[in-house]
């Protein structure tokens, strides 16, 4: 810690001195405190060891202003729960008004320091320093991450106390600031779960219209080693981020919070977590309580597999209890839905399939007209219940929808593009969890994002205020409230993530809008292909400016998840994944369908194109 400082800044080596006091190890400067083993100095590199906690020491007596600033920056990256050590570098008034949880600014190489030599004299009573760096990201008060760029320059002012003669900071930027590697070591991303407010998921069962609420992942960043389980529960109860707020709901009654005596939360030896709540939670009925427990269980299992059951209590009485087996009957998550088949177009231009997750290499035509070969196909999409499929003809001009049941006929195309060339016509389609079909028409004279209700009828033009560019690819998330678009502008293809809002009553023609489109890959100049690969994660094929094509994962907020990078593969034109992360990636490369089983290298499946999982 502390090595992540700007090169132009003044750098003093951290002092690492250990004192044993009543069995407690105190470290001067910054150091790591393992639960067992030897003390060691702290390097500013990503560390995944959950047993290591880092603490800073307060300012030493008569420390000069530069050391006070340096020590404060060091303390910001420690595991001090309430930043009490960092506050000791501030004046009394500044310590009271400083809100470290207000924001976090992440810099590429850490903050450098520039002294204001024109006005600084250590023999005077005030001193100014400018923190400098290059912005990478910000985390706001809701713990929501967003990529950022540009120059960072913020002033820090110090004053010398008239009585103690000690230098302290009396004016500083809001929140905390640190380098990227310190941020990766100190913070972790966790998906909180809420429910789509107006988009229940169509049940996979063939009988009955039962619809379950769709669970929606809302990623936030929490401090990795500062009681993350309790942090995450408090964060979930505080409500969704503003980006998702208009389209999700929480089942917790307004005002629900942890009970005052809740303390630190941890599961028992039976993997059950008991969550004591205040009296507001007692107003929920049995069904709502199950939904509350499901929100907690989905969220906590994203943090750790150690939680397999959640019990909610209020006023000393049990409200409800929910196990992971029963949680899937309360709400549906994309990551919990395992598709039956992988689909692609074979060398006879038919829609074919192979059992998902199998080692098989022999595909079979799907039942129904799209598997019979009467209509040659260029690209396809299969509904999430695997009962219907959509296909684009070879010239990208016509869209067909057919049943995956033997004996059916294909019928007329449901959509036609008037674009003059193949690249100016229809994109591959995508099905949402409600059974509706999405597609973009790339016709330069009339570019549109379209929705076909249940894959039929007149297409509804989706409003896209603020969209600057032409849509080249469409993928709707399993939760039904997020959409991923590859958008081309001025020769650059970017991945944008937006929020889907639907207006209108059941049975009416919906008014559909995609809002708050944000770049998830600002560093990539060319996005070739993408697919959803988790509740809040995508796999992306692309390249940086002047670089070579690569495959990687990205979170919906634009951050990089803690996941292994897929093995390299050249010439990738299409890629398929599923929200169930246990299933292999599948790609179209060099005229072949290939797959990547977990921990292995890419393997040839067979000849073909356009691989897709349902969705």
From Swiss-Prot:
<feature type="region of interest" description="Disordered">
    <location>
        <begin position="100"/>
        <end position="123"/>
    </location>
</feature>
<dbReference type="InterPro" id="IPR018910">
    <property type="entry name" value="Lipoprotein_LpqB_C"/>
</dbReference>
<dbReference type="InterPro" id="IPR011044">
    <property type="entry name" value="Quino_amine_DH_bsu"/>
</dbReference>
<dbReference type="Pfam" id="PF10646">
    <property type="entry name" value="Germane"/>
</dbReference>
<comment type="similarity">
    <text>Belongs to the LpqB lipoprotein family.</text>
</comment>
<keyword id="KW-1003">Cell membrane</keyword>
<feature type="lipid moiety-binding region" description="N-palmitoyl cysteine">
    <location>
        <position position="30"/>
    </location>
</feature>
<dbReference type="Pfam" id="PF10647">
    <property type="entry name" value="Gmad1"/>
</dbReference>
<keyword id="KW-0732">Signal</keyword>
<feature type="lipid moiety-binding region" description="S-diacylglycerol cysteine">
    <location>
        <position position="30"/>
    </location>
</feature>
<keyword id="KW-0472">Membrane</keyword>
<dbReference type="InterPro" id="IPR019606">
    <property type="entry name" value="GerMN"/>
</dbReference>
<keyword id="KW-0449">Lipoprotein</keyword>
<feature type="signal peptide">
    <location>
        <begin position="1"/>
        <end position="29"/>
    </location>
</feature>
<dbReference type="InterPro" id="IPR023959">
    <property type="entry name" value="Lipoprotein_LpqB"/>
</dbReference>
<dbReference type="GO" id="GO:0005886">
    <property type="term" value="C:plasma membrane"/>
</dbReference>
<feature type="compositionally biased region" description="Basic and acidic residues">
    <location>
        <begin position="114"/>
        <end position="123"/>
    </location>
</feature>
<protein>
    <recommendedName>
        <fullName>Lipoprotein LpqB</fullName>
    </recommendedName>
</protein>
<keyword id="KW-0564">Palmitate</keyword>
């Amino acid at each position: 810690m502390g090595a992540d400082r700007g090169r132009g800044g003044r750098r003093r080596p951290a002092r690492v001195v250990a004192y044993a006091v009543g069995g407690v190890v105190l470290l001067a400067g910054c150091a790591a405190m393992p639960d067992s083993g030897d003390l060691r100095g702290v390097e500013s590199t990503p560390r995944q060891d959950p047993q290591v906690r880092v603490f800073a020491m307060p300012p030493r007596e008569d420390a000069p202003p530069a050391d006070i600033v340096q020590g404060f920056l060091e303390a910001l990256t420690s595991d001090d729960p309430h930043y009490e050590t960092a506050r000791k570098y501030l004046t009394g008034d500044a310590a009271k008004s400083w809100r470290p949880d207000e924001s976090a600014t992440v810099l590429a190489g850490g903050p450098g320091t520039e002294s204001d030599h024109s006005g600084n004299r250590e023999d005077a009573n005030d001193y100014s320093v400018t923190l400098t760096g290059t912005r990478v990201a910000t985390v706001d008060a809701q713990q929501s991450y967003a990529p950022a760029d540009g120059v960072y320059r913020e002033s820090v002012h110090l004053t010398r106390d008239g009585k103690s003669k000690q230098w302290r900071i009396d004016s500083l930027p809001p929140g905390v600031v640190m380098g990227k590697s310190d941020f990766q070591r100190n913070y972790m991303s966790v998906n909180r779960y809420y429910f789509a407010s107006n988009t229940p998921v169509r049940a996979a069962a063939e009988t009955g219209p039962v619809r379950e609420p769709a669970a929606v992942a809302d990623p936030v960043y929490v401090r990795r080693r500062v009681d993350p389980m309790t942090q995450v529960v408090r964060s979930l109860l505080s409500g969704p981020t503003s980006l998702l707020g208009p389209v999700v709901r929480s089942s917790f009654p307004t005002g629900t919070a942890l009970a005052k005596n809740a303390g630190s939360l941890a599961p028992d030896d039976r993997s059950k977590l008991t969550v004591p709540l205040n009296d507001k939670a007692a107003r929920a009925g049995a069904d709502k309580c199950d939904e509350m427990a499901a929100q907690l269980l989905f969220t906590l299992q994203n943090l750790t597999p150690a939680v397999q059951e959640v019990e909610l209590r209020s006023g000393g009485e049990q409200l409800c209890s929910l196990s992971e087996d029963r949680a899937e009957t309360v709400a549906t998550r994309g990551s919990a839905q395992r598709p039956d088949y992988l689909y692609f177009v074979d060398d006879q231009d038919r829609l074919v399939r192979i059992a998902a997750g199998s080692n098989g290499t022999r595909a079979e035509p799907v039942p129904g007209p799209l598997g019979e070969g009467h209509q040659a196909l260029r690209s396809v999409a299969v509904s999430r219940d695997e009962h219907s499929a959509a296909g684009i003809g070879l010239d990208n001009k016509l869209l067909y929808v057919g049943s995956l049941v033997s004996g059916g006929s294909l019928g007329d195309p449901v959509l036609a593009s008037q674009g003059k060339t193949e690249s100016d016509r229809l994109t591959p389609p995508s099905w949402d969890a409600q059974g509706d079909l999405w597609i973009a028409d790339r016709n330069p004279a009339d570019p549109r994002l379209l929705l076909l209700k249940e894959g039929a009828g007149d297409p509804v033009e989706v409003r896209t205020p603020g969209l600057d560019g032409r849509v080249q690819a469409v993928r709707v998330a399993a939760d039904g409230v997020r959409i991923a678009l590859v958008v081309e502008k001025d020769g650059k293809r970017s991945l944008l993530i937006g929020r889907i809002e639907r207006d209108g009553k059941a049975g009416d023609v919906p008014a559909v809008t995609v809002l708050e489109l944000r770049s998830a890959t600002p560093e990539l100049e060319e996005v070739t292909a993408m697919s959803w690969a988790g509740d809040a994660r995508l796999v992306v094929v692309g390249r940086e400016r002047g670089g070579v094509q690569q495959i990687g994962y990205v979170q919906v907020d634009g951050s990089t998840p803690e996941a292994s990078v897929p093995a390299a593969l050249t010439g990738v034109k299409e890629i398929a994944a599923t929200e169930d992360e246990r299933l292999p990636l599948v790609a179209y490369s060099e005229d072949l369908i290939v797959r990547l089983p977990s921990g292995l290298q890419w393997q040839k499946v067979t000849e073909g194109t356009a691989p897709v999982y349902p969705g």
